[in-house]
């Protein structure tokens, strides 16, 4: 689900997240144009991405805290490992993961664990996405706080 758009990027809340909302939630930033690596972005685009990443992480943390989920920190990752062997290659995207202090699956203070979906599809099967209220809060937070240009 698209939450927010800037000139060069799109922020989404995945319907099939890597992390259950109660473990901290999951957002993803995609580029509007096909880009494989950060180095392919202009300086202006890199600054826009950094600002969007920061504000989106803050919004995720606040939205989940309002839902009673204690977020200790936010992790940011751009890996692209699952698509390196696809003909089109990897596409730059940034994962934003909340880290809940009381997490049941992705334990707080430990490294995140993401098996390849082909190897372990059941791992992701029952993970709950952000709810409507959390998404609404994140949208409003970004509208109010994302000031770039």
Segments from the language model and where they lie:
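HIT superfamily nucleotide-processing domains
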Residues: 1-149
């Amino acid at each position: 689900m698209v939450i927010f758009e800037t000139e060069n990027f799109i922020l989404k809340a995945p319907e099939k997240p890597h992390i259950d909302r109660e473990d901290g939630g999951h957002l993803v930033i995609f580029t509007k144009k096909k880009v494989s690596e950060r180095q392919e972005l202009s300086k202006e685009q890199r600054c826009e991405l950094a600002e969007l990443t920061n504000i989106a992480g803050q919004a995720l943390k606040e939205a989940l805290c309002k839902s009673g989920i204690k977020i200790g920190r936010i992790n940011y990752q751009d890996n692209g490992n699952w698509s390196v062997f696809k003909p089109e290659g990897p596409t730059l995207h940034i994962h934003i993961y909340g880290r809940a202090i009381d997490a049941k699956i992705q334990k707080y203070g430990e490294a995140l664990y993401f098996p390849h979906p082909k190897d372990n599809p059941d791992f992701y099967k029952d993970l709950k996405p952000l709810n409507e209220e959390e998404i609404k809060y994140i949208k409003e937070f970004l509208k109010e706080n994302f000031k770039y240009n």
